[in-house]
From Swiss-Prot:
CC annotations in GO: cytosol; exodeoxyribonuclease VII complex
One term of GO molecular function: exodeoxyribonuclease VII activity
Primary location recorded for the protein, binned into one broad class: cytoplasm
Organism in which the protein naturally occurs: Vibrio vulnificus (strain YJ016)
Keyword Nuclease annotated: yes
Record keyword Protease present: no
Any one GO BP annotation for this protein: DNA catabolic process
Protein name, per record: Exodeoxyribonuclease 7 small subunit
Enzyme nomenclature, EC number: 3.1.11.6
Domain of life: Bacteria
């Protein structure tokens, strides 16, 4: 089964996979090479999740702007 790139996964799927990886790493039964691969995958998932959260915060901030007559601003994603 091919592993999806974290940036192409939903936030929920990313967190679920990250949670599973943490459980496997905490168990301590993995060979060093396997543990390192899972750790690298976990870092990629965590970074992608953080980017999605930052993007969501930016969108919420724009939507909840205090002033009704505030100028519209362009939304830019982190991927740009």
């Amino acid at each position: 089964m091919a592993t999806k790139k974290p940036e192409n996964m939903s936030f929920e799927a990313t967190i679920e996979e990250l949670d599973n990886l943490v459980d496997q790493l905490e168990n301590g039964d993995l060979a060093l090479d396997d543990a390192l691969k899972k750790f690298e995958r976990g870092i990629a998932l965590a970074r992608a999740s953080q980017a999605k959260l930052t993007e969501a915060e930016q969108r919420v901030s724009i939507l909840l702007s205090d002033s009704d007559d505030a100028p519209l601003s362009d939304f830019s994603t982190l991927a740009e």
